[in-house]
Amino acid sequence: MELFWLEHKKLWRKRIVNICVLLCFVYIVIFGSVLSFQWFSFGSSDDYTSAFGNNFDGYGMIRESQEYGKTFGEDLTDESLQQLVREYQQMEAAGMEKELEKTDWKIINSWLGMLYPELHDPGTYQTMISYVNPDKLTGVYERREQALDDFLENSGQAGKEKEYLLNMEQKVEKPLRYEWVEGWSQLLGSMVADLGVVMALFLAIALSSLFAGEWHDNTSSLVLTTKNGWKKIALTKVLTGFAFTIEFFAILAIPNILSQVFFMGTTGWDLPIQNIKLIAVAPMNMLQAEIYEYAFALFGAIGFAGVVMFISATVKSNVLALLFSLAAVYGPMMVAEYLPYGIQKALDLLPLVGSSADIFRTNTFHILGSYIWSPYLLITIPVMIGIFCTPFTVKNWSRRLKA
């Protein structure tokens, strides 16, 4: 344990590590959460002289939007959808720009485009919610079923795969509950979903020198003469890397959650994720989706840390270790779109390469004759990869020291 604390302090005392943690905190928590809630995403936009076209009043706008959303009742029905559209059109006609910002017009417009494509007018620049006849918005759930069925057919998901997904969808409670959704859409669509891909950059910088740095600092020869031995030190370094990753995640996640609770409260936590994407098949609410996305980021970060430490133990150069580490996560992201779909899905299983937004999708893996919903594997395989790398990290570092 004493050796672990020594390695732990050694890592945290590195200036580059402190800079990485600070920069990532500023980007994720300050800009990505606090300022996004208060200014960038939810500030009112009636003052176009302000930065980003928004005022610094997001807290008040969020509260007013939540109260407005509650006026339509709890269940999403034909009548409540018609009322949402009708009131939006009335406010738009009256020039009530301030009031329009409190509506879920972006979400509702996406519903209309999906459920009522025949009502879309390609000859107008207006969004559908501005011109569609509210009285024609009927059969919401029948149309949703048809939209999901058409989507699966167009995606080539038929037979047992389609049956598997539809059986999952049957567990979604209906009628869907509705309140203000835009806040949760932003939170789950970008604020939390992007956490892992940003962490990857700073984790690579912080951990790529964990083993390779022994040669850079000319301390590798000391390891062979220490009373603890190379194997014990190597295992300690690996544990230190994993511990740092968990601490790094906590430094970002805890303030993020506190910021979310401050600005949004707990309103809407039990809404189904179908409010964000109507044809999502997962029987999950917003809180469950958020827990999944944080777990995805944590387990993916642990898996990626294992990969970075393996690379660091394999090469002697800090620069090469960093470049290979960055290539391990960002390389697959860049080339995936040019590869066959099956290979794209396989690459998604690499640590932090996939997306936690798969909870809104219908992606599956066909393994041993059974279909498995992709989010199940996206949260387990990456951390297993990191753990699997551990013995090879120790072995590779041993070979380097003996060489």
Can you annotate each of these PLM segments?
Residues 207-222, 226, 230:
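Transmembrane helix boundary and interhelical loop/hinge segments in multi-pass membrane proteins
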